[in-house]
Amino acid sequence: MLSSIPHGGGTSAEIEARRGISKEAARLIKAQTSWRRLDLLLAGNIKPGDVYATFTWDNAHYPKDRRDALRQWSLFRRKLTAKRRRCGKDLIAFWSLQRGDLGNRWHIHCVCNCGGETYEELEKLWGRGTVKPYPVERDKDGGFYTSIARYMARFRPEKLGQRAWSYTRNVRRPEKDSFFVDDNATLSVPEGCIILDRAERKTSFGEYQFIKYEIPNF
């Protein structure tokens, strides 16, 4: 992404316009919205063939409240982590505890690197209800993760301080690189990459460009 830097001088309207352009570009650079951040994390940690699953509770194990639901989920993650470690693998997982569909009952959406486990094994380890798993596949727009990220981040937390989604500590974070370019520079992606999204805005006071792309077989 390229972003102009506001310079001094000009009328108050011009200064405010330049600030607006820079702020808009910064919002895209930082990907501060919840689903965009999750989208980046999924892209760096989850691959096609991994699992996206919905975990539900039966009546016998249904949680008393949000805290109890997260406690039960933590116990399940410990069992799954231990199982994978016995096979020499680490668990990488992202999850969102939600309520609002499925009869307004608590349920958990999860994306994890458990493509090697059978679906029957996941349901046996869960042991509190049903597991509906699906293999992670390519989105219709060319990406793998955007639709999953949007869905998992769609519910707002019920209270201040609660997270819409969480993840294991061992996930890889996006790497950032910033540098100055000439005013007439044009963004281009590496050869062979697939462009998933592109945005550009230009006014008399500033401009930015944005390209989201996928590196095949990365």
Regions found by a protein language model. Give the residues of each.
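Conserved, short, structured surface segments that act as functional micro-motifs
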Residues: H107
